[in-house]
Regions:
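Acidic, PIN/NYN-like endoribonuclease modules and their adjacent C-terminal/linker elements
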Residues: 1, 102-132
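Short, well-structured N-terminal submotif of metal-dependent ribonuclease cores
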Residues: 1-38, 48-59, 130
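Short loop->beta-strand "edge-of-pocket" segments that line small-molecule binding or catalytic clefts
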Residues: 2, 35-37, 64-69, 111
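Conserved glycosyltransferase catalytic-site signature
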Residues: 6, 40, 97-99, 117
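Short, flexible loop segments at the rims of nucleotide/cofactor-binding pockets, characterized by
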Residues: 13-16, 45, 88-92
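A general structural signal for well-ordered alpha-helical segments in protein cores
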Residues: 20, 43, 53-56, 75-79, ...
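Active-site neighborhoods of divalent-metal-dependent phosphate/nucleic-acid chemistry enzymes
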Residues: 66-115
């Protein structure tokens, strides 16, 4: 499994000028190696790009994404990492949702495909981050 971060999916779905090509190539390449996965946090964040649930559901299916629940140990790790990163001077703009994503991948032992390598690498040092 490989967890695909929200920013990669938004790049693909909204045809982002700067990042769409990289995100499309990476998603396709990784789909040949790993089953692609999202969690409810990513699903909710991506849903902002759609006016209906059916549109979101079609896109998730078309992109070959499986939805996996976040295990409780990952929720625990997310909270601990959030507090630890804030204490080390992390940005006050960082929100807990990103920590749920990083902790989910870390606890499951899955790589994470993202454009936000620095935050995930800093807060989850054992996490395999695939980023530009």
């Amino acid at each position: 499994m490989l967890l695909v971060d929200t920013n990669v999916l938004v790049d693909v779905l909204q045809d982002d000028r700067q990042w769409a090509n990289w995100s499309i190539r990476q998603r396709r390449a990784q789909a040949c190696i790993h089953p692609l996965t999202i969690n409810p946090i990513i699903d909710a964040e991506v849903s902002l790009s759609f006016s209906t649930f059916e549109g979101l559901d079609r896109a998730v299916s078309t992109l070959g994404l499986a939805l996996r629940e976040i295990p409780r140990p990952a929720l625990f790790l997310a909270a601990k990492a959030f507090v630890q990163c804030r204490r080390r001077g992390g940005s006050r703009r960082q929100v807990l949702t990103g920590f749920f994503i990083g902790a989910h991948a870390a606890v499951e032992g899955w790589p994470l495909l993202t454009r936000d390598a620095s935050r995930f690498s800093t807060c989850f040092p054992t996490l395999e981050v695939m980023a530009p």
